[in-house]
From Swiss-Prot:
Coiled-coil annotated residue ranges, if any: none
Annotated source species: Shewanella baltica (strain OS155 / ATCC BAA-1091)
Source taxonomy: Bacteria, Pseudomonadati, Pseudomonadota, Gammaproteobacteria, Alteromonadales
InterPro entries assigned to the protein according to its UniProt record, in alphabetical order: SecB, SecB-like_sf
Entry's Gene Ontology cellular component terms: cytoplasm
Gene Ontology MF annotations: unfolded protein binding
Protein name: Protein-export protein SecB
Amino acid sequence: MAEVANNEQQAPQFNIQRVYTKDVSFETPNSPAVFQKEWNPEVKLDLDTRSAKLADDVYEVVLSLTVTAQNGGDTAFLCEVQQAGIFSITGLTEPQLAHSLGAYCPNFLFPYARETVGSLVGRGTFPQLNLAPVNFDALFAQYVQQRQAAATAPAAEEANA
């Protein structure tokens, strides 16, 4: 019986406490002239994530999206959204926790951020903008590889000295 209780305590737990918009900005620096041009934009998306421990097993994850649309060499709009969530996460190893905070949570937050961006762009009276899905697992794996390479680079330099 005690063994069953221990197994239940060791089982990973993931709970979403809250999802919220932390910060929003929408700018149309070249309006109204931008509305007079033929619409053929170049859209750039920049992503960033960060996490902070709020309490034991409670974390805030913030997904930041910056969408810039250039049209005819001018900035048509600049949209910035910080979508955040508070998550309770227990029973994970450090690598599993890092993956959850760096990939799983941002993947959960992305649809909310995408909807906010789409809504702001529409309110700016621009054509609908649908952001493509993002593979946060691949981005996190790339981040881990870059950190590992950076950690081994100083050791290699010292060995060559």
